[in-house]
Amino acid sequence: MTPAREIGAFNILVFLIFLWLLSKLVGRLGRRGRTTPLRGPANKSLLFGLTRYINVEADDSGAVYESWAAEYGPAFRVPGVLGSHRIVICDAKAIAHFYSKETFGYVQSPRARSTIKNIVGRGLLWSEGESHRRQRKALSPAFSNAAIRRLTSVFFDSSYKMKAAWDSILETNPDNTVIDVQKWMNHISLDSIGIAGFSHDFGSLDGKHSDVAAVFDSFGSINPSYFSMVIFLLALVFPILLKLPTNRNLLVLKLRERTSEIADVLLERTRKEKEGRTGTVEEKSIIGLLIKAESAETELHMSQEEIVAQMNVLLLAGYETTSSKTFLTWALIELSKNPEKQAKLREELLSQYTTTDPTWEQLANGLPYLDSVVHEILRLHPPVGETFRVAAEDDIIPLSRPLVTLSGQTVSSIAIGKGTMVGVPIRCMNRSEVLWGKDAKEFRPERWLEPGFGENNEVQGHRHLLTFIDGPRTCLGRGFALAEFKAVLSVLIRKYAFEFPGPGGAVPKIEKHRSILPRPKVEGQDGAKVPLRVRRVE
């Protein structure tokens, strides 16, 4: 290419970029004109806004949002990347309205959809509107109470397989054995979703190598460079940047390849079993429903691409997002910090189940302190700290209490212009002192047993929590995660006592380890490790 042509091409490129930026500016000004002008924190960076501060620098994003809500009211504006802004709502009435319009009135941002598509494909997490409703309806029978009841034995089987491995380890040093509990919770989650969802045993509890687990875990083994972080944050405005070959983006592609390969193998095996009658495929199992949807000539039909994407989603959810592994790890951390609460839970469990295991019904309704511990962990440690969506249409969001706008006007609702980014700070709402009291940041399961508890809490999510979100996108696997969490924890606490391995059981600092989603880790450990001293309960 001649120099003149290079200059001409460069000028055209600059002109196109200018037009693109101009169109974005006009669109942003239009949205601002239709959106109620709200107060909010000052911008810290023209490039990142407050996005980097919230997602990278702040120790507790929930506490940050809570402080802003106290200063600016139940809805406020937060500066984003390249001069953009987001509306954050910390009001129960507003949040209920927001979640009720999910997949239609409020949809995922282009970056979120690109990220989801890159990781798992065009499945339930990616879809919106009628496509989301169709896919969710096709999968719902696999997560009914009847289905979870049948799967409870799988969770106990995995628990006892882990117990056998731990007992073998404890034989050599019964009083001073330290075990990285997070690693074993990873194994339980992967094997349970494999058997319960796909009739496939990954064998990680038996020490078998799993490519899927290795790729999942590799997300937490790299320290993202400044360049990678910049690309990830700028992708909020320019989703196409997710295609650049950064370490993180390459890992995403590798994860998608491995999960899709495994999904293809499991699907093909199940099809052959069904056709040749060499095995039995339960039609209401996850993989059975997917096979049924593939052949159905009804509104619930799913394409091959959608089916593989659903399996990728289930592997991701079962191992990472709503997996009980993170909940279980946090439960063992909190119970090690609070030995008296650990003893109280053990007493409840052993008073009823010394030689047998509780049924699904008993796990759900017959063990009040276990239920309280589980829900206190869900409250304090949601795996997803916030959700943001884009308004697909102009909207009016009602508020339960008035706020003062940027112009000084007092309003009881806020206008949202089409294209505005709106978010809910889940961790903030779950830990809000306004909703949960002055001890909201403390691990206190007893709060769930107090008379009248929750009567003044207007949050409409599961048990007044937003951990599983709410509305049309409520986590489909909530019952699965709760049953697995309770079953595994009931075995662990009956069979073992846990404490931190430092002198006198001293509590170390628990840090946030970055992976696909944050995981807990003990300060000073290499990777996402949570070592605890484990002893048998006599």
From Swiss-Prot:
Q: What does this protein do?
A: Cytochrome P450 monooxygenase; part of the gene cluster that mediates the biosynthesis of clavilactone A, a meroterpenoid that features a unique benzo-fused ten-membered carbocyclic ring unit with an alpha,beta-epoxy-gamma-lactone moiety, forming an intriguing 10/5/3 tricyclic nested skeleton. Cytochrome P450 monooxygenases claO, claP, claQ, claU, and claW are close orthologs, suggesting that a redundant function or pseudogenes are present in the cla cluster. These monoxygenases are not involved in clavilactone A biosynthesis nor in its modification.
Q: Which organism is it from?
A: Ampulloclitocybe clavipes (Club foot)
Pathway as given in its UniProt record: Secondary metabolite biosynthesis; terpenoid biosynthesis
Membrane topology is: Multi-pass membrane protein
Keywords noted in UniProt: Heme, Iron, Membrane, Metal-binding, Monooxygenase, Oxidoreductase, Transmembrane, Transmembrane helix
The protein's gene is named: claO
Check the record and name the Gene3D superfamilies matching this protein: Cytochrome P450
Task: State what protein this is by name.
Answer: Cytochrome P450 monooxygenase claO
For this protein, what is any one GO molecular function term? monooxygenase activity
